[in-house]
């Protein structure tokens, strides 16, 4: 089915044929509930121009999505709910800790965010013993608990009394078995009827057995040699996590570097103090003494096993749009979907360093990637790659971590490089705005401590072996004092302390700038003018044409990544191919990192590749929901628990996907991610349903593929009021 396309418009112009100045006609009537195949929008005949001087097109209202009048539903006065905010996309996994404090406060009316969200549970009434899950009925394995086992051992009793009936979705075929030829949930699968049979034994009894499909198993060969049976990679051994939890894992590189860093900090204070004393006394030998002290410090310096110039080289370009690290929403099924739609690079959800060091399973699970994320990216022939870049050794998936102390970041980086070596990069989150991390000194709090941030990144480079180190920052913490320009220069050249010790550049391979301050959050548009200034600065530094007053700060080539080139990515409000092209061509960034835009319409990556708007029909969008459901069952399992987990994360995505307003319903293009829509109805019932901001409708959509929710399943939306305000400031 060919996607519907729309012509690009200026903000002040209605949707019209720009060549003939004719309005685009609707291909679907507003009240039609029968969905037609999407197609290119018709254009009125240019031979009949409108010469009526009094027919003046209305101007686009600022801050409000320009929905065509025939699709708008009038709202009763005084019923407008509170608007959504988007901070949850960055830190929803950690909102529980914030909720602990919030729970102590005085009760308020139900508005704002649900910080203490609960999701209930999805479990069998009585579980099947693990010794029975994959075995034939009459050949069970030995149960290690014997008579004390609290699980069911009789297979027929379990299937009849304790397990809910099979799902009737997916044509009654288990999507895991259909893709792999074998279901990894065994008898617990909610579609077990599609891969089980009853056979007659030699003594005439009927035995239930699981069925495997050899042809499907042959087709499901791993795409990369280090992927496991379920098609995923980057899975740390359980023994390693146990050893980490028991503090039996040594981190020699991090420990040695941390000791050197502590000693160097004390020596640096002496150097600076002595220099000040000599300047006061007018000593002529202060330069010689400073050089001698510098050499002494360099002699004590621990040479890392891999210098930044020796690490694996990476590439970012106009043809490689990037999916941003998204907490909760950036799960494996969603990343897999975005890769399929054209995203070239992905990141894990933000992982906290301390839980990684402690071997906590939940944090290490964030490093799990699909095998499609382990393939090399698709780059254009003749792309401006750096010298030494080996495309065959590149990956698409990187990890993002957060830390508030250098030793935490270093130890986390060392264990990541040891147990998940197939990471493209390890990215340090220096932009997360949530209060929990900020108060602890992590996330965007590091922006206020540039020297500390430089030490952390330099140390991460020293212990990450061949994995490059990158960073994601914001403009600053406060609106009136952005510091990203100075910070970017420091992270590329090194600061005063580094030049004093002769350490060279910190070796950051790529830098991503979100064009907002922490204080601003999502209240205003991202500042791409500031991002452009930063891009110009980094370009000058990369080309070594910037006039550096202090020549001592010129970095040592050995400490520079990618042959002396630091890649620069822009982030903020990218919602169409026009936004992407404008940022790459005019803002000067190497590529764009897409966050909320991909959550609302993941086919944004397809639009970027095609260079045009894609007006996905409701059925096409629903097919993406079905894919997510299938990928979720492959990731979390097709048993009761896996179905519940898939439903929960599908609902999380639908809380963003419902914000999409189809292109065919808009009077003006381009669409803007910050615009708030009035209440609207779609071109058919399904389109209206998918645009609903009522979470009960989201649950209804999940039931199309995952069946009725478990009686104990609960879902609380992030916001107690989960619809847009009808009016926005002009």
From Swiss-Prot:
It is found in: Cytoplasm; Nucleus. Its EC number is 1.3.1.89, 1.3.1.-. The active site is at 432 (proton donor). Its main location: cytoplasm. FMN binds at residues 325-327, 400, 472, 514, 571-573, 595-596. Gene3D superfamilies: Aldolase class I. InterPro entries: Aldolase_TIM (IPR013785), DUS-like_FMN-bd (IPR035587), tRNA_hU_synthase_CS (IPR018517), Znf_CCCH (IPR000571). It is an enzyme of class 1 (oxidoreductase). It holds the Pfam family Dus. Residues 1-126, 274-299 are annotated as: Disordered. GO terms for biological process: mRNA processing. A zinc finger (C3H1-type) spans 123-156, 174-195. GO terms for molecular function: flavin adenine dinucleotide binding; mRNA dihydrouridine synthase activity; RNA binding; tRNA-dihydrouridine47 synthase activity; zinc ion binding. Its cofactor is FMN. Residues 33-45, 274-298 have a biased composition (Basic and acidic residues). PROSITE patterns: UPF0034 (PS01136), ZF_C3H1 (PS50103). SUPFAM superfamilies: FMN-linked oxidoreductases. Keywords: Cytoplasm, Flavoprotein, FMN, Metal-binding, mRNA processing, NAD, NADP, Nucleus, Oxidoreductase, Repeat, tRNA processing, Zinc, Zinc-finger. Residues 1-12, 48-57, 111-122 have a biased composition (Polar residues). It comes from the Eukaryota. Belongs to the Dus family. Dus3 subfamily. Catalyzes the synthesis of dihydrouridine, a modified base found in the D-loop of most tRNAs. Specifically modifies U47 in cytoplasmic tRNAs. Catalyzes the synthesis of dihydrouridine in some mRNAs, thereby affecting their translation. This is tRNA-dihydrouridine(47) synthase [NAD(P)(+)]. It comes from Aspergillus oryzae (strain ATCC 42149 / RIB 40). The lineage of its organism: Eukaryota, Fungi, Dikarya, Ascomycota, Pezizomycotina. The gene is dus3.
């Amino acid at each position: 089915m060919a996607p519907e396309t729309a012509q690009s418009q200026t903000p002040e112009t209605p949707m019209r044929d720009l060549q003939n100045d004719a309005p685009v006609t609707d291909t679907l009537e507003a009240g039609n509930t029968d969905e037609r195949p999407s197609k290119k929008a018709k254009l009125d005949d240019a031979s009949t121009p409108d010469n009526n001087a009094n027919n003046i097109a209305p101007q686009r209202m600022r801050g409000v999505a320009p929905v065509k009048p025939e699709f708008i539903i009038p709202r009763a006065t005084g019923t407008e709910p509170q608007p959504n905010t988007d901070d949850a996309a960055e830190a929803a996994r950690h909102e529980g800790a914030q909720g602990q404090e919030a729970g102590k406060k005085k009760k308020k009316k139900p508005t704002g965010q649900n910080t203490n969200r609960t999701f209930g549970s999805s479990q069998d009434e009585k579980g099947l013993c693990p010794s029975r899950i994959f075995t034939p009925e009459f050949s069970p394995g030995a149960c290690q608990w014997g008579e004390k086992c609290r699980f069911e051992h009789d297979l027929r009793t379990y299937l009849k009394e304790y397990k809910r009936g099979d799902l009737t979705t997916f044509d009654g075929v288990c999507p895991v078995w259909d893709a792999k030829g074998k279901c990894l949930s065994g008898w617990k699968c909610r579609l077990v009827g599609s891969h089980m049979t009853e056979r007659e034994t030699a003594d005439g009894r009927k035995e239930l057995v699981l069925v495997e499909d050899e042809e499907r198993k042959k087709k499901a060969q791993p795409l990369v040699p280090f992927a496991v049976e379920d098609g995923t990679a980057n899975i740390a051994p359980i023994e390693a996590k146990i050893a980490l939890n028991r503090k039996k894992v040594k981190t020699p590189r991090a420990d040695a570097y941390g000791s050197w860093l502590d000693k160097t900090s004390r020596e640096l204070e002496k150097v600076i103090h002595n220099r000040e004393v000599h300047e006061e006394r007018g000593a002529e030998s202060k330069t010689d003494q400073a050089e001698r002290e510098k050499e002494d410090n360099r002699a004590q310096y621990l040479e890392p096993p891999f210098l930044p110039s020796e690490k694996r080289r990476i590439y970012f370009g106009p043809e490689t749009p990037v999916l941003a690290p998204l907490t909760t929403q950036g799960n494996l099924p969603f990343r897999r979907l975005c890769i399929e739609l054209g995203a070239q690079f992905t990141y894990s959800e933000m992982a906290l360093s301390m839980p990684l060091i402690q071997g906590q399973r939940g944090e290490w699970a964030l490093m799990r990637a699909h095998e499609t994320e382990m393939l090399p990216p698709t780059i254009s022939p003749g792309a401006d790659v750096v010298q030494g870049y080996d495309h065959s050794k590149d990956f698409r998936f990187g990890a993002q971590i957060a830390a508030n102390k250098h030793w935490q970041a270093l130890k986390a980086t060392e264990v990541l490089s040891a147990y998940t070596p197939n990471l493209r990069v390890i990215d340090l989150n220096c932009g997360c705005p949530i209060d929990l991390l900020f108060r602890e000194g992590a996330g965007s709090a590091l922006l206020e401590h540039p020297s500390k941030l430089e030490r952390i990144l330099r140390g991460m480079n020293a212990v990450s072996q061949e994995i490059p180190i990158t960073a994601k920052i914001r403009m600053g913490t406060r609106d009136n004092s952005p510091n990203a320009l100075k910070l970017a220069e420091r992270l590329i050249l090194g600061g005063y302390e580094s030049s004093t010790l002769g350490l060279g550049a910190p070796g950051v391979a790529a830098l991503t700038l979100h064009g907002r301050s922490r204080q601003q959050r999502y209240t205003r548009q991202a500042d791409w003018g500031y991002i452009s200034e930063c891009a110009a600065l980094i370009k000058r530094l990369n080309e070594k044409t910037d006039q550096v007053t202090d020549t001592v700060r010129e970095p040592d080539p050995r400490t520079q990544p990618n042959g002396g080139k630091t890649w620069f990515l822009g982030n903020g409000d990218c919602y169409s191919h026009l936004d992407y092209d404008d940022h790459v061509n005019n803002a000067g960034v190497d590529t764009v990192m897409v966050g909320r835009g991909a959550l609302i319409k993941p086919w944004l990556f397809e639009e970027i590749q095609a260079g045009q708007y894609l007006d996905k029909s409701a059925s096409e969008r629903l097919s993406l929901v079905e894919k997510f459901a299938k990928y979720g069952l492959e990731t979390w399992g097709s048993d009761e628990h896996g179905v519940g987990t898939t439903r929960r994360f599908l609902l999380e995505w639908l809380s963003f996907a419902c914000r999409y307003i189809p292109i065919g319903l808009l009077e003006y293009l381009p669409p803007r991610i910050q615009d708030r829509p009035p209440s609207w109805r779609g071109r058919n019932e399904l389109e209206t349903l998918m645009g609903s901001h009522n979470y009960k409708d989201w649950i209804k959509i999940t039931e199309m593929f995952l069946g009725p929710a478990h009686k104990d399943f609960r879902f609380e939306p992030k916001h107690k009021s989960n619809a847009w305000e009808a009016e926005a400031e002009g």
